Amino acid sequence: MQNELAQTIPELISWTKEREFSLSLPSDRLAFLLVISIYNNEQTDGELLESDLIDLFRYVSNVFEQSEASLLQRANNAINDLVKQRFLNRFSSEFTEGLAIYRVTPLGVGVSDYYVRQREFSSLRLSIQLSIVADEIQRASVAAEQGGDERYWRNNVFAPLKFSVAEIFDSIDLSQRMMDENQHQIREQIAGLLSQNWHEAIINCQQLLDETSINLRELQDTLNAAGDKLQSQLLRIQSCLISRDDLAFVDQLIVNLQNKLDRIMSWGQQAIDLWIGYDKHVHKFIRTAIDMDKNRVFGQRLRQSIQNYFSSPWLLYTAKAEALLDLRDDEAMLNEMEAVGELPMALEYESLTDVQTQIVTAIQAELAHFRDTAQPINLGAVLREQLARYPQSRHFDVARIIVDQAVKLGMASQDHQAVYPVWQPIDDFSAAVQAHLIDQYDK
Protein backbone atom coordinates (compact mmCIF):
# COMPACT_ATOMS: atom_id res chain seq x y z
CA MET A 1 0.00 0.00 0.00
CA GLN A 2 2.80 2.40 0.86
CA ASN A 3 4.58 1.57 -2.42
CA GLU A 4 1.42 2.28 -4.36
CA LEU A 5 1.04 5.60 -2.57
CA ALA A 6 4.69 6.51 -3.20
CA GLN A 7 4.19 5.88 -6.92
CA THR A 8 1.00 7.91 -7.01
CA ILE A 9 2.45 11.12 -5.53
CA PRO A 10 5.05 11.77 -8.29
CA GLU A 11 2.47 10.98 -10.95
CA LEU A 12 0.01 13.40 -9.37
CA ILE A 13 2.64 16.14 -9.17
CA SER A 14 3.65 15.61 -12.81
CA TRP A 15 0.02 15.61 -13.91
CA THR A 16 -0.59 18.92 -12.09
CA LYS A 17 2.58 20.45 -13.53
CA GLU A 18 1.69 19.49 -17.10
CA ARG A 19 -1.75 21.13 -16.90
CA GLU A 20 -0.44 24.39 -15.38
CA PHE A 21 -3.42 25.01 -13.12
CA SER A 22 -3.94 28.63 -12.06
CA LEU A 23 -7.15 28.85 -10.06
CA SER A 24 -8.65 32.15 -8.90
CA LEU A 25 -12.32 32.53 -7.99
CA PRO A 26 -13.47 35.87 -6.55
CA SER A 27 -16.96 35.99 -5.07
CA ASP A 28 -18.70 36.98 -8.31
CA ARG A 29 -16.85 34.31 -10.34
CA LEU A 30 -17.65 31.65 -7.74
CA ALA A 31 -21.31 32.66 -7.72
CA PHE A 32 -21.33 32.46 -11.54
CA LEU A 33 -19.86 28.94 -11.44
CA LEU A 34 -22.40 27.79 -8.81
CA VAL A 35 -25.30 29.18 -10.84
CA ILE A 36 -23.98 27.42 -13.96
CA SER A 37 -23.68 24.14 -12.06
CA ILE A 38 -27.21 24.32 -10.66
CA TYR A 39 -28.66 25.27 -14.04
CA ASN A 40 -26.67 22.51 -15.73
CA ASN A 41 -28.16 19.88 -13.38
CA GLU A 42 -31.60 20.76 -14.70
CA GLN A 43 -30.57 20.16 -18.33
CA THR A 44 -31.14 16.71 -19.80
CA ASP A 45 -28.16 16.82 -22.19
CA GLY A 46 -25.75 18.67 -19.87
CA GLU A 47 -24.93 21.19 -22.60
CA LEU A 48 -25.06 24.98 -22.29
CA LEU A 49 -25.25 27.62 -24.99
CA GLU A 50 -23.42 30.92 -24.77
CA SER A 51 -26.75 32.75 -24.56
CA ASP A 52 -27.61 30.66 -21.49
CA LEU A 53 -24.35 31.62 -19.81
CA ILE A 54 -24.92 35.32 -20.56
CA ASP A 55 -28.41 35.17 -19.03
CA LEU A 56 -27.00 33.48 -15.92
CA PHE A 57 -24.24 36.08 -15.68
CA ARG A 58 -26.83 38.87 -15.95
CA TYR A 59 -28.61 37.46 -12.90
CA VAL A 60 -25.35 37.30 -10.92
CA SER A 61 -24.43 40.82 -12.04
CA ASN A 62 -27.76 42.18 -10.78
CA VAL A 63 -27.28 40.55 -7.38
CA PHE A 64 -23.79 42.05 -7.08
CA GLU A 65 -25.20 45.43 -8.25
CA GLN A 66 -22.76 45.74 -11.15
CA SER A 67 -23.13 48.07 -14.12
CA GLU A 68 -25.50 47.04 -16.91
CA ALA A 69 -23.61 49.01 -19.57
CA SER A 70 -20.66 46.64 -19.94
CA LEU A 71 -22.63 43.43 -19.25
CA LEU A 72 -21.80 41.58 -22.48
CA GLN A 73 -18.10 42.36 -22.27
CA ARG A 74 -17.89 41.30 -18.63
CA ALA A 75 -19.91 38.15 -19.38
CA ASN A 76 -17.51 37.16 -22.18
CA ASN A 77 -14.53 37.83 -19.91
CA ALA A 78 -16.06 35.69 -17.16
CA ILE A 79 -16.82 32.83 -19.58
CA ASN A 80 -13.31 32.93 -21.06
CA ASP A 81 -11.85 33.02 -17.56
CA LEU A 82 -13.75 29.87 -16.51
CA VAL A 83 -12.68 28.14 -19.73
CA LYS A 84 -9.05 29.14 -19.18
CA GLN A 85 -9.10 27.79 -15.62
CA ARG A 86 -10.68 24.51 -16.87
CA PHE A 87 -13.99 24.96 -15.07
CA LEU A 88 -15.77 24.91 -18.45
CA ASN A 89 -15.07 23.17 -21.76
CA ARG A 90 -15.93 24.99 -25.00
CA PHE A 91 -16.86 23.04 -28.16
CA SER A 92 -17.28 24.59 -31.60
CA SER A 93 -16.92 23.51 -35.23
CA GLU A 94 -16.95 24.98 -38.72
CA PHE A 95 -20.55 23.79 -39.18
CA THR A 96 -21.73 25.76 -36.13
CA GLU A 97 -19.73 28.94 -36.61
CA GLY A 98 -20.53 31.48 -33.91
CA LEU A 99 -22.49 28.92 -31.90
CA ALA A 100 -20.38 27.30 -29.17
CA ILE A 101 -21.46 24.61 -26.73
CA TYR A 102 -20.18 24.51 -23.14
CA ARG A 103 -19.91 21.65 -20.65
CA VAL A 104 -18.93 21.81 -16.99
CA THR A 105 -15.59 20.03 -16.42
CA PRO A 106 -14.95 17.55 -13.58
CA LEU A 107 -13.02 20.32 -11.81
CA GLY A 108 -16.03 22.63 -12.07
CA VAL A 109 -18.34 19.89 -10.82
CA GLY A 110 -16.04 19.19 -7.87
CA VAL A 111 -15.75 22.84 -6.80
CA SER A 112 -19.47 23.55 -7.13
CA ASP A 113 -20.34 20.26 -5.42
CA TYR A 114 -18.21 21.29 -2.44
CA TYR A 115 -20.06 24.57 -1.98
CA VAL A 116 -23.57 23.35 -2.83
CA ARG A 117 -24.01 19.73 -1.78
CA GLN A 118 -21.83 19.69 1.32
CA ARG A 119 -24.05 22.35 2.92
CA GLU A 120 -27.01 19.97 2.71
CA PHE A 121 -25.78 18.11 5.80
CA SER A 122 -28.59 16.73 7.97
CA SER A 123 -29.36 13.77 10.20
CA LEU A 124 -31.42 12.20 7.38
CA ARG A 125 -28.55 12.36 4.92
CA LEU A 126 -26.15 11.04 7.56
CA SER A 127 -28.50 8.13 8.31
CA ILE A 128 -28.68 7.19 4.63
CA GLN A 129 -24.89 7.38 4.26
CA LEU A 130 -24.34 5.20 7.33
CA SER A 131 -26.95 2.72 6.09
CA ILE A 132 -25.09 2.38 2.77
CA VAL A 133 -21.81 1.94 4.65
CA ALA A 134 -23.33 -0.75 6.86
CA ASP A 135 -24.57 -2.72 3.84
CA GLU A 136 -21.19 -2.49 2.08
CA ILE A 137 -19.24 -3.57 5.18
CA GLN A 138 -21.71 -6.41 5.81
CA ARG A 139 -21.21 -7.78 2.29
CA ALA A 140 -17.44 -7.36 2.60
CA SER A 141 -17.38 -9.23 5.93
CA VAL A 142 -19.38 -12.13 4.48
CA ALA A 143 -17.00 -12.31 1.52
CA ALA A 144 -14.01 -12.18 3.89
CA GLU A 145 -15.29 -15.14 5.91
CA GLN A 146 -15.75 -17.18 2.74
CA GLY A 147 -12.11 -16.52 1.84
CA GLY A 148 -10.22 -16.83 -1.42
CA ASP A 149 -7.07 -15.83 -3.24
CA GLU A 150 -5.66 -12.30 -3.50
CA ARG A 151 -7.71 -11.49 -6.59
CA TYR A 152 -10.87 -12.56 -4.76
CA TRP A 153 -10.03 -10.28 -1.81
CA ARG A 154 -9.30 -7.33 -4.10
CA ASN A 155 -12.62 -7.62 -5.95
CA ASN A 156 -14.97 -8.54 -3.10
CA VAL A 157 -13.44 -6.95 0.02
CA PHE A 158 -10.84 -4.32 -0.83
CA ALA A 159 -12.74 -2.67 -3.71
CA PRO A 160 -16.05 -1.95 -1.89
CA LEU A 161 -14.21 -0.79 1.24
CA LYS A 162 -11.82 1.44 -0.73
CA PHE A 163 -14.16 2.97 -3.31
CA SER A 164 -17.45 3.05 -1.40
CA VAL A 165 -16.98 2.97 2.37
CA ALA A 166 -13.83 5.12 2.48
CA GLU A 167 -15.34 7.75 0.16
CA ILE A 168 -18.50 7.98 2.27
CA PHE A 169 -16.36 8.35 5.40
CA ASP A 170 -14.46 11.16 3.68
CA SER A 171 -17.76 12.80 2.71
CA ILE A 172 -19.01 12.65 6.32
CA ASP A 173 -15.70 14.04 7.57
CA LEU A 174 -15.90 16.92 5.09
CA SER A 175 -19.48 17.63 6.15
CA GLN A 176 -18.39 17.77 9.77
CA ARG A 177 -15.72 20.29 8.87
CA MET A 178 -18.44 22.35 7.19
CA MET A 179 -20.42 22.15 10.43
CA ASP A 180 -17.38 23.54 12.28
CA GLU A 181 -17.29 26.46 9.86
CA ASN A 182 -21.03 26.97 10.32
CA GLN A 183 -20.60 27.13 14.10
CA HIS A 184 -17.96 29.85 13.72
CA GLN A 185 -20.33 31.84 11.51
CA ILE A 186 -23.12 31.50 14.09
CA ARG A 187 -20.74 32.73 16.80
CA GLU A 188 -19.93 35.78 14.69
CA GLN A 189 -23.65 36.44 14.19
CA ILE A 190 -24.30 36.22 17.94
CA ALA A 191 -21.35 38.51 18.71
CA GLY A 192 -22.65 41.02 16.17
CA LEU A 193 -26.15 40.93 17.65
CA LEU A 194 -24.96 41.38 21.22
CA SER A 195 -22.66 44.26 20.30
CA GLN A 196 -25.50 46.28 18.74
CA ASN A 197 -28.78 46.07 20.66
CA TRP A 198 -28.80 43.07 22.94
CA HIS A 199 -32.36 43.81 24.18
CA GLU A 200 -33.70 42.82 20.77
CA ALA A 201 -30.98 40.25 20.13
CA ILE A 202 -31.66 37.96 23.09
CA ILE A 203 -34.46 36.03 21.35
CA ASN A 204 -32.45 35.67 18.12
CA CYS A 205 -29.37 34.56 20.05
CA GLN A 206 -31.35 31.95 21.95
CA GLN A 207 -32.85 30.64 18.72
CA LEU A 208 -29.41 30.29 17.09
CA LEU A 209 -28.02 28.56 20.19
CA ASP A 210 -30.94 26.12 20.44
CA GLU A 211 -30.98 25.24 16.72
CA THR A 212 -27.26 24.49 16.69
CA SER A 213 -27.47 22.42 19.88
CA ILE A 214 -30.38 20.36 18.52
CA ASN A 215 -28.60 19.73 15.19
CA LEU A 216 -25.41 18.59 16.93
CA ARG A 217 -27.28 16.22 19.25
CA GLU A 218 -29.32 14.71 16.40
CA LEU A 219 -26.17 14.05 14.38
CA GLN A 220 -24.37 12.56 17.38
CA ASP A 221 -27.32 10.26 18.20
CA THR A 222 -27.27 9.03 14.60
CA LEU A 223 -23.52 8.36 14.78
CA ASN A 224 -23.79 6.56 18.13
CA ALA A 225 -26.54 4.29 16.81
CA ALA A 226 -24.37 3.01 13.94
CA GLY A 227 -20.78 3.47 15.13
CA ASP A 228 -20.42 0.36 17.32
CA LYS A 229 -21.95 -1.91 14.67
CA LEU A 230 -19.58 -0.61 12.00
CA GLN A 231 -16.55 -1.11 14.25
CA SER A 232 -17.59 -4.69 15.03
CA GLN A 233 -17.96 -5.47 11.31
CA LEU A 234 -14.49 -4.07 10.59
CA LEU A 235 -13.04 -6.20 13.41
CA ARG A 236 -14.86 -9.18 11.92
CA ILE A 237 -13.07 -8.64 8.60
CA GLN A 238 -9.75 -8.03 10.37
CA SER A 239 -10.01 -11.36 12.19
CA CYS A 240 -10.07 -13.12 8.81
CA LEU A 241 -6.67 -11.61 7.92
CA ILE A 242 -4.73 -13.48 10.59
CA SER A 243 -1.72 -15.30 9.10
CA ARG A 244 -2.47 -13.86 5.64
CA ASP A 245 0.70 -11.90 4.86
CA ASP A 246 -0.31 -11.51 1.22
CA LEU A 247 -3.30 -9.39 2.29
CA ALA A 248 -1.38 -6.68 4.15
CA PHE A 249 -2.93 -4.02 1.91
CA VAL A 250 -6.41 -5.03 3.12
CA ASP A 251 -5.30 -4.91 6.76
CA GLN A 252 -3.85 -1.42 6.26
CA LEU A 253 -7.13 -0.27 4.70
CA ILE A 254 -9.09 -1.65 7.67
CA VAL A 255 -6.85 0.27 10.08
CA ASN A 256 -7.36 3.48 8.09
CA LEU A 257 -11.13 3.00 8.10
CA GLN A 258 -11.13 2.38 11.85
CA ASN A 259 -9.18 5.60 12.42
CA LYS A 260 -11.57 7.56 10.21
CA LEU A 261 -14.58 6.12 12.03
CA ASP A 262 -13.07 6.95 15.42
CA ARG A 263 -12.43 10.53 14.28
CA ILE A 264 -15.99 10.88 12.99
CA MET A 265 -17.44 9.51 16.24
CA SER A 266 -15.32 11.68 18.53
CA TRP A 267 -16.08 14.84 16.54
CA GLY A 268 -19.74 14.88 17.54
CA GLN A 269 -19.23 14.69 21.29
CA GLN A 270 -16.36 17.18 21.19
CA ALA A 271 -18.45 19.64 19.18
CA ILE A 272 -21.33 19.28 21.66
CA ASP A 273 -19.05 19.88 24.67
CA LEU A 274 -17.52 22.98 23.08
CA TRP A 275 -20.92 24.34 22.12
CA ILE A 276 -22.29 23.79 25.64
CA GLY A 277 -19.39 25.83 27.03
CA TYR A 278 -20.03 28.61 24.52
CA ASP A 279 -23.78 28.52 25.31
CA LYS A 280 -23.06 29.01 29.02
CA HIS A 281 -20.66 31.88 28.24
CA VAL A 282 -23.28 33.72 26.17
CA HIS A 283 -25.98 33.27 28.83
CA LYS A 284 -23.62 34.52 31.55
CA PHE A 285 -22.78 37.57 29.46
CA ILE A 286 -26.47 38.34 28.85
CA ARG A 287 -27.37 37.96 32.54
CA THR A 288 -24.53 40.24 33.62
CA ALA A 289 -25.39 42.82 30.95
CA ILE A 290 -29.01 42.85 32.13
CA ASP A 291 -27.94 43.33 35.76
CA MET A 292 -25.56 46.18 34.90
CA ASP A 293 -28.11 47.91 32.68
CA LYS A 294 -30.87 47.47 35.26
CA ASN A 295 -28.78 49.15 37.95
CA ARG A 296 -27.81 52.01 35.62
CA VAL A 297 -31.43 52.67 34.58
CA PHE A 298 -32.61 52.58 38.21
CA GLY A 299 -29.92 55.06 39.27
CA GLN A 300 -30.76 57.36 36.36
CA ARG A 301 -34.49 57.36 37.19
CA LEU A 302 -33.78 58.00 40.88
CA ARG A 303 -31.60 61.03 40.08
CA GLN A 304 -34.25 62.42 37.73
CA SER A 305 -36.95 61.98 40.39
CA ILE A 306 -34.89 63.89 42.96
CA GLN A 307 -34.12 66.71 40.53
CA ASN A 308 -37.78 67.06 39.50
CA TYR A 309 -39.13 66.81 43.05
CA PHE A 310 -40.53 70.36 43.18
CA SER A 311 -42.35 70.00 39.86
CA SER A 312 -43.45 66.40 40.51
CA PRO A 313 -43.47 65.72 44.28
CA TRP A 314 -43.43 62.16 45.54
CA LEU A 315 -43.48 60.27 48.85
CA LEU A 316 -40.99 57.65 49.99
CA TYR A 317 -42.24 54.77 52.10
CA THR A 318 -39.74 52.57 53.91
CA ALA A 319 -40.20 49.29 55.73
CA LYS A 320 -37.83 47.38 57.95
CA ALA A 321 -38.08 43.65 58.63
CA GLU A 322 -36.05 41.40 60.85
CA ALA A 323 -33.43 39.45 58.92
CA LEU A 324 -34.32 35.80 58.44
CA LEU A 325 -31.79 33.26 59.59
CA ASP A 326 -30.64 31.19 56.63
CA LEU A 327 -29.47 27.84 57.92
CA ARG A 328 -28.25 26.80 54.49
CA ASP A 329 -25.13 28.96 54.79
CA ASP A 330 -24.08 27.27 58.05
CA GLU A 331 -24.89 23.86 56.62
CA ALA A 332 -22.84 24.55 53.49
CA MET A 333 -19.93 25.73 55.62
CA LEU A 334 -20.07 22.56 57.74
CA ASN A 335 -20.24 20.36 54.65
CA GLU A 336 -17.26 22.15 53.15
CA MET A 337 -15.25 21.67 56.34
CA GLU A 338 -16.12 17.97 56.44
CA ALA A 339 -15.19 17.49 52.79
CA VAL A 340 -11.99 19.53 52.80
CA GLY A 341 -10.76 19.34 56.37
CA GLU A 342 -7.91 21.48 57.59
CA LEU A 343 -5.48 22.78 54.98
CA PRO A 344 -1.94 24.04 55.43
CA MET A 345 -1.58 27.82 55.41
CA ALA A 346 0.21 27.70 52.06
CA LEU A 347 -2.82 26.05 50.43
CA GLU A 348 -5.56 28.23 51.90
CA TYR A 349 -7.33 30.52 49.46
CA GLU A 350 -8.51 34.07 50.12
CA SER A 351 -12.24 34.39 50.68
CA LEU A 352 -14.32 36.15 48.03
CA THR A 353 -15.10 38.99 50.47
CA ASP A 354 -11.40 39.69 51.06
CA VAL A 355 -10.72 39.69 47.33
CA GLN A 356 -13.61 42.08 46.65
CA THR A 357 -12.45 44.36 49.47
CA GLN A 358 -9.00 44.56 47.91
CA ILE A 359 -10.48 45.31 44.50
CA VAL A 360 -12.81 47.99 45.91
CA THR A 361 -9.90 49.68 47.71
CA ALA A 362 -7.78 49.69 44.55
CA ILE A 363 -10.63 50.99 42.39
CA GLN A 364 -11.47 53.76 44.86
CA ALA A 365 -7.86 54.96 44.78
CA GLU A 366 -7.87 54.93 40.96
CA LEU A 367 -11.17 56.81 40.60
CA ALA A 368 -10.41 59.34 43.36
CA HIS A 369 -7.65 60.74 41.16
CA PHE A 370 -10.24 61.81 38.56
CA ARG A 371 -12.35 63.59 41.16
CA ASP A 372 -9.37 65.35 42.79
CA THR A 373 -8.11 66.64 39.43
CA ALA A 374 -11.67 67.41 38.16
CA GLN A 375 -11.18 65.14 35.14
CA PRO A 376 -14.23 63.39 33.63
CA ILE A 377 -14.39 59.61 34.02
CA ASN A 378 -14.71 57.65 30.78
CA LEU A 379 -16.15 54.39 32.10
CA GLY A 380 -15.34 52.54 28.88
CA ALA A 381 -11.64 53.45 29.01
CA VAL A 382 -11.40 52.86 32.77
CA LEU A 383 -13.10 49.46 32.51
CA ARG A 384 -10.88 48.34 29.65
CA GLU A 385 -7.72 49.44 31.49
CA GLN A 386 -8.73 47.79 34.77
CA LEU A 387 -10.10 44.54 33.28
CA ALA A 388 -6.82 43.98 31.45
CA ARG A 389 -5.23 43.43 34.88
CA TYR A 390 -7.59 40.61 35.88
CA PRO A 391 -8.37 37.16 34.43
CA GLN A 392 -11.53 36.75 32.37
CA SER A 393 -13.29 34.86 35.18
CA ARG A 394 -13.30 38.06 37.29
CA HIS A 395 -14.23 40.55 34.58
CA PHE A 396 -17.93 40.77 35.36
CA ASP A 397 -17.42 41.14 39.14
CA VAL A 398 -14.70 43.77 38.69
CA ALA A 399 -16.83 45.67 36.13
CA ARG A 400 -19.77 45.77 38.54
CA ILE A 401 -17.53 47.12 41.33
CA ILE A 402 -16.07 49.83 39.06
CA VAL A 403 -19.54 50.96 37.94
CA ASP A 404 -20.83 51.08 41.53
CA GLN A 405 -17.83 53.11 42.75
CA ALA A 406 -17.99 55.51 39.79
CA VAL A 407 -21.71 56.20 40.36
CA LYS A 408 -20.97 57.01 44.00
CA LEU A 409 -18.46 59.70 42.99
CA GLY A 410 -20.74 61.68 40.71
CA MET A 411 -23.00 61.69 37.68
CA ALA A 412 -23.00 62.49 33.97
CA SER A 413 -24.45 65.79 32.81
CA GLN A 414 -25.57 64.20 29.52
CA ASP A 415 -27.89 61.84 31.42
CA HIS A 416 -30.35 64.75 31.73
CA GLN A 417 -30.44 65.27 27.97
CA ALA A 418 -32.05 61.88 27.10
CA VAL A 419 -29.14 61.04 24.79
CA TYR A 420 -28.21 57.38 24.51
CA PRO A 421 -24.45 56.80 24.83
CA VAL A 422 -22.62 54.59 22.35
CA TRP A 423 -21.48 51.08 23.19
CA GLN A 424 -17.76 50.80 24.02
CA PRO A 425 -15.85 47.49 24.12
CA ILE A 426 -14.26 46.83 27.52
CA ASP A 427 -12.38 43.58 26.93
CA ASP A 428 -11.34 41.15 24.19
CA PHE A 429 -14.30 38.83 24.81
CA SER A 430 -17.13 40.90 23.22
CA ALA A 431 -18.18 42.62 26.48
CA ALA A 432 -19.25 46.29 26.12
CA VAL A 433 -20.59 49.14 28.25
CA GLN A 434 -22.94 52.04 27.49
CA ALA A 435 -22.25 55.11 29.65
CA HIS A 436 -21.74 58.89 29.40
CA LEU A 437 -18.72 60.72 30.81
CA ILE A 438 -19.08 61.30 34.56
CA ASP A 439 -18.25 65.01 34.83
CA GLN A 440 -20.23 66.21 37.86
CA TYR A 441 -18.80 65.11 41.19
CA ASP A 442 -20.48 65.12 44.61
CA LYS A 443 -18.89 67.49 47.09
UniProtKB/Swiss-Prot annotation:
Family membership noted in the UniProt record: Belongs to the MukF family.
Keyword annotations of the record: Calcium, Cell cycle, Cell division, Chromosome partition, Cytoplasm, DNA condensation
SUBUNIT field: Interacts, and probably forms a ternary complex, with MukE and MukB via its C-terminal region. The complex formation is stimulated by calcium or magnesium. It is required for an interaction between MukE and MukB.
Broad class of where this protein is predominantly found: cytoplasm
Region (Leucine-zipper) residue spans: 209-237
GO CC terms, sorted: cytoplasm; nucleoid
Stated role: Involved in chromosome condensation, segregation and cell cycle progression. May participate in facilitating chromosome segregation by condensation DNA from both sides of a centrally located replisome during cell division. Not required for mini-F plasmid partitioning. Probably acts via its interaction with MukB and MukE. Overexpression results in anucleate cells. It has a calcium binding activity.
Cross-referenced InterPro entries: Chromosome_partition_MukF, MukF_C, MukF_C_sf, MukF_M, MukF_M_sp, MukF_WHTH, WH-like_DNA-bd_sf, WH_DNA-bd_sf
One Pfam family per UniProt: MukF_M
Claim: Mitochondrion is one of the keywords in the record: no
GO BP terms, alphabetized: cell division; chromosome condensation; chromosome segregation; DNA replication
Name of the molecule in the record: Chromosome partition protein MukF
Location of the protein in the cell: Cytoplasm, Nucleoid
Origin superkingdom: Bacteria
Disulfide bonds: none
Any one GO molecular-function label of the UniProt entry: calcium ion binding
